[in-house]
Amino acid sequence: MALRRPPRLRLCARLPDFFLLLLFRGCLIGAVNLKSSNRTPVVQEFESVELSCIITDSQTSDPRIEWKKIQDEQTTYVFFDNKIQGDLAGRAEILGKTSLKIWNVTRRDSALYRCEVVARNDRKEIDEIVIELTVQVKPVTPVCRVPKAVPVGKMATLHCQESEGHPRPHYSWYRNDVPLPTDSRANPRFRNSSFHLNSETGTLVFTAVHKDDSGQYYCIASNDAGSARCEEQEMEVYDLNIGGIIGGVLVVLAVLALITLGICCAYRRGYFINNKQDGESYKNPGKPDGVNYIRTDEEGDFRHKSSFVI
């Protein structure tokens, strides 16, 4: 038979728990504490947003409020000395006692914001809370580059790039309005193709194009704020005319052979030699052979001496 503890003893056993609870509540009283209804707000660019910072417990009627912005490892004041500071001046205000509202947010407002409260009359004088603000920007029309014509078996690279979206968009490619997988081997529908798509850079690479890869291509850039696409561009895959290439090479070789043969025939018939001799046989007729003109110091004029060979 179990022994029952008298009611008075049960009450005494509960007294330590009661005193601990009172002690705990006494520690909380007079300690400033903060909370937020949303620590990770997300907003579209050019909209307004409220950064929630609420005082739940404090014995100080007029605590000091400060807001700071933490971005790129730098900390700057947003609200200090009861004034909006920095790049938020003119487009932000304090709601209630501590919350911060921002109008017309831009992508540069994406950062960590720290709400700090100093209550001099409280047991715990300081408390703070950090809020991460994300400003989303819809992508603009991406720039797409698609080769117009590629021979069968050659490599081809398609590019898609967008620079305005935030967070950075992901890219997807379409051929004839059919979405392409990141790897052609992952889908039996594209078993005749060999390509790989990098959804982060927007690059679509064909290791060796086939005739089935011909078609209309376009790219879509998308993030949580929206999406945008470029205009369709056609890529044609054509067969190489091996017979025509060989025939063209043979024609060129035949023409070169005929030119060489003609030059050799002209040289053998003496066309180049006769022209050279004709040029060397030409002499100046102004001075006949066998006549010497000598001028002496005694004569003022020329004296003619001649020798004749008969």
Swiss-Prot record:
Q: PTMs?
A: Proteolytically cleaved from endothelial cells surface into a soluble form by ADAM10 and ADAM17; the release of soluble JAM3 is increased by pro-inflammatory factors.
One GO cellular component term of this record is: cell-cell junction
Membrane topology of the entry: Single-pass type I membrane protein
Extracellular compartment residues: 32-241
What tissues express this gene product? Detected on round and elongated spermatids (at protein level). Highest expression in placenta, brain and kidney. Significant expression is detected on platelets. Expressed in intestinal mucosa cells. Expressed in the vascular endothelium. Found in serum (at protein level). Also detected in the synovial fluid of patients with rheumatoid arthritis, psoriatic arthritis or ostearthritis (at protein level).
Gene3D superfamilies (UniProt xref) = Immunoglobulins
> Signal peptide position in this chain?
1-31
Lipidation positions, renumbered (S-palmitoyl cysteine): 264-265
Please name every pair of cysteines joined by a disulfide bond in this record.
53-115, 160-219
Keywords on record: Angiogenesis, Cell adhesion, Cell junction, Cell membrane, Differentiation, Disease variant, Disulfide bond, Glycoprotein, Immunoglobulin domain, Lipoprotein, Membrane, Palmitate, Secreted, Signal, Spermatogenesis, Tight junction, Transmembrane, Transmembrane helix
**What does the function comment of this entry state?**
Junctional adhesion protein that mediates heterotypic cell-cell interactions with its cognate receptor JAM2 to regulate different cellular processes. Plays a role in homing and mobilization of hematopoietic stem and progenitor cells within the bone marrow. At the surface of bone marrow stromal cells, it contributes to the retention of the hematopoietic stem and progenitor cells expressing JAM3. Plays a central role in leukocytes extravasation by facilitating transmigration through the endothelium.
Q: Quaternary form? A: Interacts with ITGAM. Interacts with GORASP2.
Protein name as annotated:
Junctional adhesion molecule C
Q: What organism, scientifically named, is this protein from?
A: Homo sapiens
> What does the organism's lineage look like at the top?
Eukaryota, Metazoa, Chordata, Craniata, Vertebrata
